[in-house]
Curated annotation (Swiss-Prot):
Native source species: Shewanella pealeana (strain ATCC 700345 / ANG-SQ1)
Membrane topology classification: Peripheral membrane protein
Record GO terms (molecular function): proton-transporting ATP synthase activity, rotational mechanism
Subcellular location: Cell inner membrane
Family: Belongs to the ATPase delta chain family.
Name assigned to this protein: ATP synthase subunit delta
Role description: F(1)F(0) ATP synthase produces ATP from ADP in the presence of a proton or sodium gradient. F-type ATPases consist of two structural domains, F(1) containing the extramembraneous catalytic core and F(0) containing the membrane proton channel, linked together by a central stalk and a peripheral stalk. During catalysis, ATP synthesis in the catalytic domain of F(1) is coupled via a rotary mechanism of the central stalk subunits to proton translocation.
UniProt-listed SUPFAM superfamilies: N-terminal domain of the delta subunit of the F1F0-ATP synthase
Record keywords: ATP synthesis, Cell inner membrane, Cell membrane, CF(1), Hydrogen ion transport, Ion transport, Membrane, Transport
Subunit and interaction comment: F-type ATPases have 2 components, F(1) - the catalytic core - and F(0) - the membrane proton channel. F(1) has five subunits: alpha(3), beta(3), gamma(1), delta(1), epsilon(1). F(0) has three main subunits: a(1), b(2) and c(10-14). The alpha and beta chains form an alternating ring which encloses part of the gamma chain. F(1) is attached to F(0) by a central stalk formed by the gamma and epsilon chains, while a peripheral stalk is formed by the delta and b chains.
GO cellular component: plasma membrane; proton-transporting ATP synthase complex
């Protein structure tokens, strides 16, 4: 996984810098997400494994994407195809979106709770996280009844485990040591 991230980073950075310069970050995010979906298609997967010449692969890939991508994005896809890197397009798109959020001072927080949270609880979490992270926070909520009670919050590198399951686990670890 780290290798894919390392390979994808320069492509995502180049695309983001260019999109920022052109004031077209949103459209580039859409184009990269579309191209990533195409690359993940089960029909396309065998072609990305290297059985097709890079020039033909780029031509085919761009043809499939059609008018969904502009000329500059086509150039990026050609370079990636020449280097045998079209397979990392989903990681490029993901890193591009992360760069976009970082630039906009936004962060996506995953909230996993034992029960559904009320709108007041979500608002309080959002305000608290925005204050702590000094960024605008977008909450993605899910329910995991195995937590017993409480929440686990993940936002970037920050992980806060306030679940009963986590407390029991930490208590067990301290008793065993």
């Amino acid at each position: 996984m780290a290798e894919i991230t390392t390979i994808a980073r320069p492509y995502a950075k180049a695309a983001f810098d260019f999109a920022l310069e052109q004031k077209a970050v949103e459209s580039w995010a859409e184009m990269l997400n579309f191209a990533a979906l195409v690359s993940e298609n089960e029909t396309m997967q065998p072609l990305l494994s290297g059985s097709v010449a890079s020039g033909k692969l780029a031509e085919l890939f761009i043809g499939v994407c059609g008018e969904q991508i502009n000329e500059q994005a086509q150039n990026l896809l050609k370079v990636m195809a020449e280097n045998g890197r079209l397979v990392v397009l989903p990681a490029v798109a993901q890193q591009f979106v992360e760069m976009q959020r970082e630039y906009a001072k936004e962060v996506e927080a995953q909230i996993v709770s034992a029960t559904e949270l009320t709108s007041e609880q979500l608002q309080a979490l959002s305000v608290s996280l925005e204050k702590r992270l000094a960024r605008k926070v977008k909450l993605n909520c899910s329910i995991d009844t195995s937590l017993i009670a409480g929440v686990i919050i993940t936002a970037g590198d920050l992980v806060i485990d306030g679940s009963v399951r986590g407390k029991i686990s930490r208590l067990s670890d301290s008793l065993q040591s």
